Design a protein with these regions (language model features):
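Active-site-adjacent structural elements that line small-molecule/cofactor binding pockets in enzymes
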Residues: 1-206
Length: 206
């Protein structure tokens, strides 16, 4: 999956078709992780207003969900209007590709998570203190009418090493506590060797 894609910088219909195509090619293995970003210059380079990036992301996700799930799609908003689009292919996953919303616990991002999110990608202080972050997220999305138990959460899993070797047992020690706190998925960063044979041997225990 993407972690994260600034979806508002892409044309919604093109993004929807591209992601759906990837989902078909991968046999339904795509997750779309999105966020609003922080760099004003990126939006200016695309001719977009940085101050409205939240709404631009929301409307992009609205279009994606419609094109993934319906056959004859019409849409109208202040940002974009179209009628009678038949977008193919449809994603393998139904009703569409799972959307993971990145961000801190604030009203705008939590409303977006409650509305669109299959999962949450914590950011900033909520990623640093994941246990408090998950608790705050669940309270926030519940206030927006979403069952927080239906939202997956990704957390960073630090890798323990002894020299050049991964200590898998030590690495996994924190997993039960994180799972109990509501973390459902884990990401980690490994310096993977470039040669296939070496990479296969390196990752075998993982």
């Amino acid at each position: 999956g993407t972690n994260i894609l600034l979806a508002a910088l892409r044309r919604p219909a093109v993004l929807a078709k591209s992601v759906a195509t990837l989902d078909v090619l991968s046999g339904g293995r795509v997750d779309l992780g999105v966020g609003v970003g922080w760099q004003k210059e990126e939006y200016e380079a695309c001719g977009l207003d940085f101050t409205t990036r939240g709404r631009q992301l929301d409307h992009t996700l609205e279009v994606c969900e419609l094109l993934w799930s319906a056959q004859d799609v019409s849409y109208a908003s202040a940002e974009l209007s179209f009628s009678s689009i038949h977008a193919m292919p449809k994603p393998v996953q139904t009703p569409g590709v799972p959307i993971w919303v990145g961000g801190t616990v604030n009203n705008r991002s939590m409303e977006r998570l409650a509305r669109f999110g299959s999962g949450w990608i914590p950011w900033g202080p909520d990623a640093s203190d994941i246990f408090s972050g998950v608790k705050a997220m669940r309270e926030a999305v519940t206030a927006f009418g979403r069952d927080s138990a239906t939202i997956a959460v990704v957390g960073a899993l630090p890798v323990s090493r002894h020299g050049d070797q991964i200590d898998l047992d030590a690495t996994m020690e924190s997993v039960p506590k994180m799972v109990d706190a509501g973390i459902t998925d884990f990401r980690t960063y490994l310096p993977i060797p470039k040669k296939v044979e070496e990479a296969t041997e390196y990752l075998a225990d993982v």
